[in-house]
Amino acid sequence: MNLEQIYKDCGAYLEGHFLLSSGKHSQFYLQSAKVLEDPKLAAKLCDELAKIIASYKIEFDSICSPALGGILAGYELARACSKRFIFTERVNKEMTLRRGFEVKKGEKFIICEDIITTGGSALESAKIIESLGGIVVGFAALANRGFCAVENLKSPRKDNAKLPENLPLFTLGNFEFEIYDETNCPLCKKGNKAIKPGSRGN
């Protein structure tokens, strides 16, 4: 499966100057909503991701995603795995569990995102689940931006990664884009203003 080509064909592989949800800057942005707006394609991708997870024989009960970007990917993955789905959401800048969702003590979760950059939002969701008595057994995403180690791709962990080293991350592919702090961003130095798409922007 050529994930990069799928993103390009869907108009989801964007070039410009972007402020990522992690606070970093990048010349490229992956707009997964453009991929997931096609239900058949969303199902195909998450069916494939479910097969990868199943091949590692990890036992889990439910899937949780951080809103907003992770909801479609998480729901489709839950469908493919025949598991329960819940989501966390940000209220006053803090991740929380609302809408009557509950976590049973000992319930095992995979945290699912559309894209994992440093893994900050996924880690926030994991901490919520664990604070309520759940157990996080792994992470999943359509794509990894190259910072977190991916179990099925055998890709290494980089310094910016926030996901726990002892839990696996499963994805369909890696996109290795350079990301920058605002202070050393070459696009900022050229006078270009970063726009804020995605989970914490428009």
Swiss-Prot record:
Record's protein name: Orotate phosphoribosyltransferase
Swiss-Prot/TrEMBL cofactor(s): Mg(2+)
Record-stated family: Belongs to the purine/pyrimidine phosphoribosyltransferase family. PyrE subfamily.
Residues reported in the UniProt entry to bind 5-phospho-alpha-D-ribose 1-diphosphate: K93, E113, D114, I115, I116, T117, T118, G119, G120, S121
SUPFAM superfamilies listed in its UniProt record: PRTase-like
GO BP terms, alphabetized: 'de novo' UMP biosynthetic process; pyrimidine nucleobase biosynthetic process
Catalytic activity, EC: 2.4.2.10
GO molecular function terms listed in the Swiss-Prot or TrEMBL record: magnesium ion binding; orotate phosphoribosyltransferase activity
Reaction catalysis annotation: orotidine 5'-phosphate + diphosphate = orotate + 5-phospho-alpha-D-ribose 1-diphosphate
Keyword terms, alphabetized: Glycosyltransferase, Magnesium, Pyrimidine biosynthesis, Transferase
Transferase recorded as keyword: yes
Pathway(s) of this molecule: Pyrimidine metabolism; UMP biosynthesis via de novo pathway; UMP from orotate: step 1/2
Classification via InterPro entries: OPRT, Orotate_PRibTrfase_bac, PRibTrfase_dom, PRTase-like
ATP-binding in keyword set: no
Role, per record: Catalyzes the transfer of a ribosyl phosphate group from 5-phosphoribose 1-diphosphate to orotate, leading to the formation of orotidine monophosphate (OMP).
Gene giving rise to this polypeptide: pyrE
Binding positions (orotate): T117, R145
Domain of life (superkingdom): Bacteria
Organism of provenance: Campylobacter jejuni subsp. jejuni serotype O:2 (strain ATCC 700819 / NCTC 11168)
Quaternary data: Homodimer.
PANTHER family: OROTATE PHOSPHORIBOSYLTRANSFERASE (PTHR19278), URIDINE 5'-MONOPHOSPHATE SYNTHASE (PTHR19278:SF9)
A Pfam family that the UniProt record links to this protein: Pribosyltran
